[in-house]
Amino acid sequence: ALVGMGGGSRAVVRMGEGKLDEANKILGNCTLLLMILGLAATVVFQLCKEPMLYLFGATENTIGYSMDYLNIYLYGSIFVELALGLNFFITSQGFSTVGMASVIIGAVVNIVLDPILIFGLNMGVKGAALATITAQAVSAVWVVRFLCGRRTKLRIQRRLLRLDAKVLAPVLALGLSPFIMQSTESLVNIAFNSSLKTYGGDPAVGAMTICSSIMQVFSLLFQGLSQGAQPIVGYNYGAGQLDRVKRTFRLLFFSSLCFSCAACAALELFPGLFVSLFNDKPELVEIAVWALHIYAAGMFMLGVQFSCQQTFVALGQTRVSLFLALLRKVILLIPLILLLPRFLSDQVFAVFLAEPVADILAATTTGAIFFWRLPRILEKRRLELEHRPI
């Protein structure tokens, strides 16, 4: 997200402005940086993998399996970086089918190889890791091959594989917002799990795992809608087609809001149906259903949060998108997880309540800022275009 989404958003705006050479420079810089980051991740995480695994919940019983998996998986870091990071440059040009194919191809390869390596060759966890990095390598080859081909306007060119601070600085600044949204998820999980372990024990932690898994599935759908609209917004903003920017955002906003309201209603009315997809133990299902009623209560506002924040990214609004990325999880959610149990007698209820409170406050703030700033952003762009030399 840091390199791919920031670079893809910047590149599509430059394409809209008719500056294809600059867009290709962005792609070249991002490609090389993704390769460097992939190699660096392999080295760094190999050096500190054991304490890192314990930090994220590994125990004496599971550390051996975790180490076996990570020892192999880390060697595929460069493939992950290229497959995921460069995919943004494909979808930002409108090749959504190609972008989707890169994900599906990797998934199919992984599904086919898993039983062969895990059971057929009796490799166990190591086989699962090998299947995963093989699938990621296939996806990476697919993505790179497409971006070197003739169908795409943005092409990977050897002469442009260089690092230029002037090109990368705005890319990284813009990509920081989605990067923080994804990376802070680990901090949120640590805060939730440690608090629930203290106040409710293992059953509460298990219920939280189910609730967060359900929420993650729906969040991916919100992200898909937002990321599908991003290249359209960015290209037309760069091209000066400001009415199209407004129309695209309106469609994104109302479709996201309708979907989030429908998802919230479904989870509140049929929580048992969704919980049973993840676990069938009666004791855990009972507490998870109770928890999901609380946890999903603010979900109806997520459509506002995602559509407004991702549109800020598409418009190149670095500072405000960074603030909004920090707002929901770092500024609101984590402090609420730690503070609410101090003020409510039912402390487990208080921990789960932190999620809807943060969702509603963050979405309300995001929406207010967006609808106040959008007319000013578009008016500034209109004036820039009027005074631009012909």
Stretch-by-stretch model annotation:
Residues 1-43, 80-99, 207-271, 302-321:
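Small-residue-rich hydrophobic transmembrane alpha-helices
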Residues 40-72, 262-289:
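Short membrane-interface helical motifs at transmembrane helix boundaries
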Residues 132, 141-185, 376-390:
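Interhelical loop/hinge segments that connect adjacent transmembrane helices in multipass membrane
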Residues 97, 107-140, 286, 330-364, ...:
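Membrane-interface helix-loop junctions in multi-pass transport and translocation proteins
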Residues 53-60, 116-123, 183-213, 217, ...:
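Helix-terminus/linker motif at the lipid-water interface of multi-pass membrane proteins
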Residues 61-65, 125-126, 167-174, 195-216, ...:
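Interfacial/gating helices of multi-pass transporter permease domains
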Residues 73-91, 99-107, 128-141, 223-226, ...:
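Short runs within selected transmembrane alpha-helices of multi-pass transporters and secretion channels
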Residues 60-86, 173, 210, 216, ...:
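Alpha-helical transmembrane segments of multi-pass membrane proteins
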